[in-house]
Amino acid sequence: MKRPVTGKDLMIVNMGPHHPSMHGVLRLIVTLDGEDVVDCEPILGYLHRGMEKIAENRAIIQYLPYVTRWDYLATMFTEAITVNGPEQLGNIQVPKRASYIRVIMLELSRIASHLLWLGPFMADIGAQTPFFYIFREREFVYDLFEAATGMRMMHNFFRIGGIAADLPYGWIDKCLDFCDYFLTEVVEYQKLITRNPIFLERVEGVGIIGGEEAINWGLSGPMLRASGIPWDLRKVDRYESYDEFEWDIQWQKQGDSLARYLVRLNEMTESIKIIQQALEGLPGGPYENLESRGFDRKRNPEWNDFEYRFISKKPSPTFELSKQELYVRVEAPKGELGIFLIGDQSGFPWRWKIRPPGFINLQILPELVKRMKLADIMTILGSIDIIMGEVDR
């Protein structure tokens, strides 16, 4: 970090890595001239665990529990990107029912991630009351996850060729009830937060990013859409069954922290629309493509054969990753989550490069906070929405 040469006395302040507003183990070395930010240097790597190297020494089904530790608040998306790559390499068809259930889980995970962004974001800028309301709705989403997958977090629900299990009895009605309830709560958020004059003073005109600047920095997700660029991979790539549903891309023109807040708030309403359509049009059929499982078993095993005794046990998939290169991506809550995958005719990937949206979006932070006040760092960092698990990997 270059220290500016001026006649004034500058103060260097360490924010983090143990700071409640850093959203993880992020450290910022901030140079201050009074209350004005002169320079800011993010220090990363406190949560680095070598996730890419671990992937090169695991079969895909073995690696699935690891990927939920990237963005641990939106684990369905990390699971989706992990199974989408091998499915495309192996030309594996996902049953329509499984695809619809995947969409439902992805959008519920998007809502949970946005809720867990909104609550601490409001607390960062001094509004404690909405935090408790928001976490109440988040618990309902986690109850749905627990009923369907058995886990509130780290679900391990996606499988190559489908999902781990079908939806339990009564889950669809419970989810539809939540959708109706949540739409009324979003209206309450708008009354409580959006029109609050103190909130508007803290976020309006703070951390402005232009559309061209956002593209040049490689930003994605709400960061890009809040700068006037209506770019959403669910519309662009049409992965899973998103092209079968009616919904709109949410975007704003202002490019400030308020615009990023509005994009995420409106996205939750669009997610509810997608979930309702998927639940009402949920097709029948299998929830998993069993051909994706590489069985190597005799057609007529003998009665006392060791293999025959354990025929009811599901073996792990043993298919090979073909020798090709592939880049797959999904629209995660924080932006474009991508994987560059290289296979080499073995069960393990030769290269597994992760493109985390939080890491890319965080790079613009030093530019945004310069010439701003110290208190605005919390607002700007909160509006970016980062999780250090995926930033450091």
From Swiss-Prot:
It comes from the Eukaryota. It catalyses: a plastoquinone + NADH + (n+1) H(+)(in) = a plastoquinol + NAD(+) + n H(+)(out); a plastoquinone + NADPH + (n+1) H(+)(in) = a plastoquinol + NADP(+) + n H(+)(out). One of its GO terms (molecular function) is NAD binding. It is an enzyme of class 7 (translocase). GO terms for cellular component: chloroplast thylakoid membrane. SUPFAM superfamilies: HydB/Nqo4-like (SSF56762). GO terms for biological process: photosynthesis, light reaction. InterPro entries: NADH_Q_OxRdtase_suD (IPR001135), NADH_UbQ_OxRdtase_49kDa_CS (IPR014029), NDH1_su_D/H (IPR022885), NiFe-Hase_large (IPR029014). The lineage of its organism: Eukaryota, Viridiplantae, Streptophyta, Embryophyta, Tracheophyta. Its main location: plastid. Coiled coil: none annotated. It is found in: Plastid, Chloroplast thylakoid membrane. NDH is composed of at least 16 different subunits, 5 of which are encoded in the nucleus. Belongs to the complex I 49 kDa subunit family. It holds the Pfam family Complex1_49kDa. This is NAD(P)H-quinone oxidoreductase subunit H, chloroplastic. Keywords: Chloroplast, Membrane, NAD, NADP, Plastid, Plastoquinone, Quinone, Thylakoid, Translocase, Transport. It is a peripheral membrane protein. Its EC number is 7.1.1.-. NDH shuttles electrons from NAD(P)H:plastoquinone, via FMN and iron-sulfur (Fe-S) centers, to quinones in the photosynthetic chain and possibly in a chloroplast respiratory chain. The immediate electron acceptor for the enzyme in this species is believed to be plastoquinone. Couples the redox reaction to proton translocation, and thus conserves the redox energy in a proton gradient.
